[in-house]
Amino acid sequence: MIRMLRFGAKALAVLALATLSQAAAAGGNSTKDTPAEPVERGVYFSGYDVVTDSRYTYSGIIVALNGDMGRDGFFARAYGAYGNFDQNPGDGRQWQGDVALGYMFTRSSIGYEIYAGVDYQNVRLRPDDPTAEVRGTEWGFKVGAGIETEKELPYYFRLEGNYSTAFNSYWARARVGVNRGRFTFGPEASVVGDEDFDAQRVGGFVTFDVKLPQFRPMELTLSVGHQFVSGSNNNTDGTGGIGGGEGTYGLVNLSVTF
């Protein structure tokens, strides 16, 4: 009887070890077959905007302070831009940069972000015009916010904007569209201005992924439409100003996560 109990105990031990070994092997194969996606710590973006009598180049970076853009948390943001524009007479140059701290969170497949920081703007006119409302250097307080649907949804919506006390400048844009595989497209509308001008844009956009070997997927956005202007930019001679004149606009934007 004792021998039978010992034999049974040994058999159970062998069976338990075999079961654990199979479970460990299965777990190892599962991890190997479905590797975890890399965590996105931030995003870099850059673009070029052109409209009648105005050219504008910008770059920026957003970094999640918790190390994961997919989680709720604080982020740091830096942005810089350079523009040149034609006026009557002469031309002008514009430099702008800001640094900000913000918070992002997701609820029901919709992402939200808010941020605030310090803004720097410098505008130089040639020839100089002492009567111009937007001229010289100004520091200001900048606030911004955005809302965007997640990419997994069949439809797309994004609303974003910001305001700075430097020259009372503002910008806002709304996009609605549909997601079709790698492509997202639809209409867009935006407003931009400062103490010197106001402009409104209506057009369309398309966004798609660009995949290159050894690189993370990049997102490219193209948009085109018409700009309407008022204020000092609405010159009778057709020459624009700091925000450009009335006419066709085009935008190229590239973003990549890291």
PLM region spans:
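Conserved binding-pocket/active-site segment within a compact domain
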Residues: 170-175, 186, 190
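Outer-membrane pore/translocation modules
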Residues: 74-169, 189, 224-248, 256
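Hydrophobic, lipid-facing positions within transmembrane beta-strands of outer-membrane proteins
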Residues: 42, 55-59, 63, 95-99, ...
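Short glycine/proline- and aromatic-enriched beta-strand/turn motifs that initiate or cap beta-hairpins
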Residues: 24-88, 228, 236, 249, ...
